[in-house]
């Protein structure tokens, strides 16, 4: 069974990135086992490889970090569960298929949200997990941005639990309007992070065996 490691306290993004990159190297070079990091970051905007500078609107005192993951701008901060699976897609029980990997991540999060009676949706040409809200509009509850080095995955998923959604006003997240972002709390679901973690671990083990 793949081990989940919960990093305590609010984590600096760059410190966590270094931790991820170091462990990816260990998986590649030393055959270290696969793991999943569970993180809650201090406030930060991150930009993926497809970002456009005009999508950074007003970031005040929140730092901006340019990363190597896929995607555009997003926000990380307190109340958001960030999940970093470091998996070796070259193993015999895996597939060297990035699209399949992302599909499995999507299925994992949709199944986890279903536990709370929330139906997650996929939208064509838009990465992430979406929730149907007022008047048939869709709001994003989970962002996905990954990177692979020698078929070892890192970066991952950010799910809004009790996130301050106003912080998304400083960017156009994932190239979308900030009004199209939601959280479990905004949907009327209040859950402790530790309880949410138990659910995602259970659902993970059903998909990534």
UniProtKB/Swiss-Prot annotation:
GO terms for biological process: protein modification process. The active site is at residue 174. Its EC number is 2.3.1.181. GO terms for cellular component: cytoplasm. The keyword Ubl conjugation does not apply. Pathway: Protein modification; protein lipoylation via endogenous pathway; protein N(6)-(lipoyl)lysine from octanoyl-[acyl-carrier-protein]: step 1/2. Substrate binds at residues 69-76, 143-145, 156-158. It is found in: Cytoplasm. The record marks 140 as: Lowers pKa of active site Cys. Its main location: cytoplasm. GO terms for molecular function: lipoyl(octanoyl) transferase activity. It catalyses: octanoyl-[ACP] + L-lysyl-[protein] = N(6)-octanoyl-L-lysyl-[protein] + holo-[ACP] + H(+). Keywords: Acyltransferase, Cytoplasm, Transferase. It comes from the Bacteria. InterPro entries: aa-tRNA-synth_II/BPL/LPL (IPR045864), BPL_LPL_catalytic (IPR004143), Octanoyltransferase (IPR000544), Octanoyltransferase_CS (IPR020605). Residues 30-209 form the BPL/LPL catalytic domain. Catalyzes the transfer of endogenously produced octanoic acid from octanoyl-acyl-carrier-protein onto the lipoyl domains of lipoate-dependent enzymes. Lipoyl-ACP can also act as a substrate although octanoyl-ACP is likely to be the physiological substrate. Belongs to the LipB family. In the reaction, the free carboxyl group of octanoic acid is attached via an amide linkage to the epsilon-amino group of a specific lysine residue of lipoyl domains of lipoate-dependent enzymes. This is Octanoyltransferase. The gene is lipB.
């Amino acid at each position: 069974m793949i081990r989940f490691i919960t990093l305590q306290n609010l984590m600096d993004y760059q410190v966590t990135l270094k931790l991820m990159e170091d462990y990816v190297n260990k998986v590649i070079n030393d055959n270290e086992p696969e793991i999943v990091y569970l993180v809650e970051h201090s406030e930060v905007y991150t930009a993926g490889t497809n970002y456009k500078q005009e999508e950074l609107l007003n970031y005040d005192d929140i730092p901006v970090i340019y990363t190597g993951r896929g995607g555009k701008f997003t926000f990380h901060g307190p109340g958001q569960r960030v999940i970093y699976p470091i998996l070796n897609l070259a193993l015999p029980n895996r597939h060297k298929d990035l699209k399949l990997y992302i599909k499995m991540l999507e299925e994992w999060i949709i199944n986890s949200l279903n536990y709370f009676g929330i139906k997650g949706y996929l939208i064509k040409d838009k990465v992430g997990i979406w929730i149907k809200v007022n008047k048939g509009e869709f709001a994003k509850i989970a962002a996905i941005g990954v990177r692979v080095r020698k078929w070892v995955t890192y970066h991952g998923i950010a799910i809004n639990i009790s996130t301050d959604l106003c912080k998304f006003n400083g960017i156009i997240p994932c190239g979308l309007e900030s009004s199209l972002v939601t959280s479990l709390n905004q949907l009327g679901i209040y859950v402790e992070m530790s309880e949410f973690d138990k659910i995602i671990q259970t659902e993970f083990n059903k998909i990534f065996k």
